[in-house]
Amino acid sequence: MDENKKRALAAALGQIEKQFGKGAVMRMGDHDRQAIPSISTGSLGLDIALGIGGLPKGRIVEIYGPESSGKTTLTLSVIAAAQRMGSTCAFVDAEHALDPDYAGKLGVNVDDLLVSQPDTGEQALEITDMLVRSNAVDVIIVDSVAALVPKAEIEGEMGDAHVGLQARLMSQALRKITGNIKNANCLVIFINQIRMKIGVMFGSPETTTGGNALKFYASVRLDIRRTGAVKEGDEVVGSETRVKVVKNKVAPPFRQAEFQILYDQAFYRNGEIIDLGVQQGLVEKSGAWYAYKGSKIGQGKANAAKYLEENPEIGQEIEQQIRAKLLVTSANTKATPVAEDLADADI
């Protein structure tokens, strides 16, 4: 840059700092780049698919899928992981359907969980914004976007047309709270439902509720689907689940994870550790037998997982090695801008 441009830039920066305060404009090279802090989802495979070890703090996340696909279970698992780190969590229950007993089974400390059951969409989003601006809440779940009913619709007659009200409400609210979420370093997760577009001849007819604003403001979007049932004999004890990362601004997108959700304990975590350990060559598999560092740990996946449950230190050791091999570290965060460009591209 020539001297005239340097002087002009220095004058402009000085004027900006004088008018808007120090730090209004920063030079990226003046500060060390740090890895984005994250909160585990409770699923090792999904943490790895997300690229940074979990869901990013200071960002908006959207989780959507069909009914009974595991959306609320996934968010409750995030709350349980955050609470184990000492974080404060809130659940904005617009559907009025939160089951405290089920949340407790998933490891959530329900006594410390902040819960709101708002009457209108405006009230729900205003409560969310106030919790974010308090700088005291680390994780907020909004369940769900489809249940954020505008006040005008609630007060109107059944059958009245209210075109675009919910979409305008979401657009206005997200414009308002996005900056606050970043400043508070708070993770806000919106659960969303799927609807079908009428008359679609090509491509997927599926769409999410609440307009397009959330698709743009979300740094991460997860598509969760139930792909099968987990059975013990004839009894169904869980669900085979697939999650696809359809948008990711903090790591490469379009990865996916498959895992089991057991109805009494959320994710079958030890089973994931065994599967990923075998994939990465950390756990040896010979026929039906599994071994770690030359020692047999069980015949069949269920017995090997039970061994890890009885010896948690070995499970943690294998998990740490898997994370070290597969996750993005602070040393290679220079790939982050590329990931952000890919996430916003029309592919």
Curated annotation (Swiss-Prot):
Main subcellular location: cytoplasm
Annotated phenotype, changing S295N: In strain: ATCC 17587
Classification via InterPro entries: AAA+_ATPase (IPR003593), DNA_recomb/repair_RecA (IPR013765), DNA_recomb/repair_RecA_CS (IPR020584), P-loop_NTPase (IPR027417), RecA-like_C (IPR049261), RecA-like_N (IPR049428), RecA_ATP-bd (IPR020588), RecA_C_sf (IPR023400)
GO molecular function: ATP binding; ATP hydrolysis activity; ATP-dependent DNA damage sensor activity; damaged DNA binding; single-stranded DNA binding
Effect of S38A: In strain: ATCC 17587
Effect of R84K: In strain: ATCC 17587
Matches recorded under Pfam families: RecA, RecA_C
Binding residue positions for ATP: G65, P66, E67, S68, S69, G70, K71, T72
GO CC annotation terms, alphabetical: cytosol
Keywords: ATP-binding, Cytoplasm, DNA damage, DNA recombination, DNA repair, DNA-binding, Nucleotide-binding, SOS response
Cross-referenced HAMAP family: RecA
Family: Belongs to the RecA family.
UniProt name for this protein: Protein RecA
Organism lineage string: Bacteria, Pseudomonadati, Pseudomonadota, Gammaproteobacteria, Pseudomonadales
